[in-house]
Amino acid sequence: ARAKGTGSQVDRSAGAVDWLTRLIGLGLVLVLAAIQMWDPPLIEAARLRLFDQLQRSAPRPIPDQSPVAIVDIDDASLAEIGQWPWPRSVFADLIDRLGEAGAVAIVFDILFAEADRLSPPAYAQFLEPIDARVAALLRTLPSNEEAMAAAIRRYPVVLGEAGIGAAQAKLDGGFAPPARFAWLGQGVEEALPAFPYGVTALPALAGNARGLGLVTVVPELDGVVRRAPTAARVGSRVLPGLAIEALRVATDTPTIIVAGDAAGIGSLNLAPRFAINRYVQLRASITFNYEFTS
């Protein structure tokens, strides 16, 4: 009888320990889930440092041949062409040269939001007090915007637009983007990053561009830019990120198909050959949080 009672006590003790272990495990899961949802700065900073370390220890290999060429505005360019900003006629010539070289998409991460002060009609006002006759001749010449717009019409050009928090009375915004979106899932559009206002290129330029893409990026808490929006709401419109729009134009895809839910984007499809998935918080990290599949 004594042995039987001892065994019963052992069974009860084992059961109590088992329930205690389960409660501790459940508590840890709830705490970790709360931390993940809260995402305090300390945790985010640690995650960012880990990401940077992964970039250094296992960077994406650079291919021997890349389909992307960067035309940089560097010191050599400034020494040859002159100080910034350059006349729009320079960009018109650049577009023509790139188009003739066979570029399937010519992408500018520059905002052409204001009129070119070096355009002949605009420059005429500065010469008026000096030589009215020369000023009158300059007003008869086409503007640099017209030259650039003509080049944009000839080739597939993507221009940038910025999302901002305050309206700018002197700058254009709200131009209808060429990209169309098809939404698969409820609440995806509402979950996108939002900017109340936008600043885009002049209508003469934006109206002739094959694409408009968002150039705005939001730094992390340490001030480093590691991610770029894949798409965002700018005012009442939805704009793709500049890289997404460049790929859309290059593949001649009219509609971007976005699947997901109120928690975010699950996948973004540009064409049967291009699917972009594994997005985190609607933003693509530079290396580790996106992939292209074919």
Annotate each predicted stretch with a short phrase.
Residues S294:
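Short, Gly/Ser/Thr-enriched beta-strand-loop segments that form substrate-interacting elements
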Residues R2, D11-E291:
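Non-transmembrane functional regions of envelope-associated proteins
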